[in-house]
Amino acid sequence: MRVLVLGSGVIGTASAYYLARQGFEVTVVDRQPAVAMETSFANAGQISPGYASPWAAPGVPLKAIKWLLERHAPLAIKLTGDVDQYLWMAQMLRNCTASRYAVNKERMVRLSEYSRDCLDELRAETGINYENRSLGTTQLFRTQAQVDAAAKDIAVLEQSGVPYELLDRDGIARVEPALAGVKDILAGALRLPNDQTGDCQLFTTKLADMALKLGVEFRFGQDIQRLDFAGDRINGVWIDGKLETADRYVLALGSYSPQMLKPLGIKAPVYPLKGYSLTVPITNGDMAPTSTILDETYKVAITRFDNRIRVGGMAEIAGFDLSLNPRRRETLEMIVNDLYPRGGDLSQASFWTGLRPATPDGTPIVGATAFRNLFLNTGHGTLGWTMACGSGRLLADLIARKKPQISAEGLDISRYGNSREVAKHGQTAPAHQQ
């Protein structure tokens, strides 16, 4: 059985790998010249199942108003006049209740924990190396109010059986010695010892190499134009003016997924959350982080690779704008100087931006659609790296009609009440328009 995977980020590549392991004949198509060249290229590098949380949370609407007035705010909104932007933000606001937050976080943690287990198994089986570490994640709180607010997340961790440790200032210095000199500006921390780190782009490249050995074909530099459909089946995909056919189709185009699905009558509430990162060469390893640090105040992660520090985070709701905002670089540099002033050489840092495909409830869209041979693996937001292996394996099981190792409840697009609307055949814009 032939499967055509659209998109070669970490999600599409993981989908292809796990499908090939189950014996499918897989082809991956992407407009870029190689895998992981867009959102997967320079993300924060953290694999943090326990910190899998939706942006839509109680109190966020009021915080967002306050953040609009702050220079180093973790969230910024640039209104584009796009109706989809307004609809997505309205849906996000509806998810900012305590009850919906709990449901959404449980779904995210469920998939993230499974994904971490899949990654562990993959690493044990293949020895894949991607500058990975298994030294946990430490979430830093600068105020006592932040420490107190972590109680709701701890309750979900306990419910899900995720190990954690609350740290005082001395405890922070114990697990992250380079923070000993600045511990007085911190109120405490929450540490998840089972979390991991690694270079997502390097991982995806090596996973693609392993997929090639399983017979997966990668076709780069090709324009994915539209899906051809009739009734409840996909007939093929128009790629560079030619109709390509398969038995099953997987859409893993990140933020560009809705453009492909809209002509089919499928409304996928996926919208780009623009994020930024700095990659900083390490000059003093003893003054750099040992693993991943999350700064709760600025929503920024600082991650240790072998000889580099990756600083990533923030979110701009600004459509498909990929311009580099110098104020965001200023914020990232400020945080590094605040916590690790002697760890790396900021003058040699590389600055990057990417569009994370976010859903309004934070949970990705993984699973079947109203079309019998079309499957989705998209909408992972800031957690594509964390959820990649689990999402790919889950999707492969669903396509193979095998019982997944975790519950898929609440993960597919049907949770939005997404009944297919009548759509005109073949009328769509290129899925990769910018």
Curated annotation (Swiss-Prot):
It comes from the Bacteria. NCBIfam families: PRK00711.1. GO terms for molecular function: D-amino-acid dehydrogenase activity. Belongs to the DadA oxidoreductase family. Pathway: Amino-acid degradation; D-alanine degradation; NH(3) and pyruvate from D-alanine: step 1/1. Oxidative deamination of D-amino acids. FAD binds at residues 3-17. GO terms for biological process: D-alanine catabolic process. Its EC number is 1.4.99.-. HAMAP family: DadA (MF_01202). Keywords: FAD, Flavoprotein, Oxidoreductase. It is an enzyme of class 1 (oxidoreductase). It catalyses: a D-alpha-amino acid + A + H2O = a 2-oxocarboxylate + AH2 + NH4(+). InterPro entries: DadA, FAD-dep_OxRdtase, FAD/NAD-bd_sf. The lineage of its organism: Bacteria, Pseudomonadati, Pseudomonadota, Gammaproteobacteria, Pseudomonadales. The keyword Oxidoreductase applies. The gene is dadA. This is D-amino acid dehydrogenase. Its cofactor is FAD. GO terms for cellular component: cytoplasm; plasma membrane. Pfam families: DAO (PF01266). It comes from Pseudomonas putida (strain GB-1).
